[in-house]
Amino acid sequence: MAEPSQSQIPDAVLESPVTGVGLVPGTLADQLGEGLSLLVFLRHFGCIFCRETVGDLRAAVAADPSYPRVLFFYQGSPTEGRAFLRRDWPEARAVADPEQEFYERFGVRRASFLEGLGPAVLRSRARARAKGHENGRRSGDVWRMPGIFAVEAERVVWAHQPRHAADHPDFASLPVTISAAR
């Protein structure tokens, strides 16, 4: 379910130092810059839906030059992030969060059994497989849910709270959805 949040991101979060892939040295605030940014919290790298999300977002960004800047968050080290993104989106920017501190600060929760492995998730595997995605080696917290936040001027202006591990918005139409919510 997507709904606007309009919440201010605390200074302590914005001023937190970050490392990862394709980042400028500094803090989370340094990565956001001006304008709209899409913060995408991925599930573990072995998850078929993590791979689907990265692939779908890459296609949406390629199709729309005005697409919001995407900043991924992932549960691994910078080395793991480089290896994953080298294959799936070499130009992507991503924050390494092996301790899942940003996940917690943004309220990206852990899944229940049904949210992680329920019927809706199992049905969604066919969708991801039809796009050429498969599960890989598990890494990180396999129960951590995904999360997506549109951020502008240090405020969350829209958020997608997934109903289950495979739930994500239509990335191609996401800029229109965010614009309507603002």
Residue ranges of model-derived segments:
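Thiol/selenol-based redox catalytic cores and closely related redox-interacting motifs
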Residues: 97-166
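N-terminal targeting signals for export/organelle localization
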Residues: 1-20, 181-182
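Short active-site neighborhood of thiol/selenol oxidoreductases, capturing the structured segment around
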Residues: 28-58, 69, 73
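Structural microenvironment flanking redox-active thiols in thiol-disulfide oxidoreductases
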Residues: 53-104
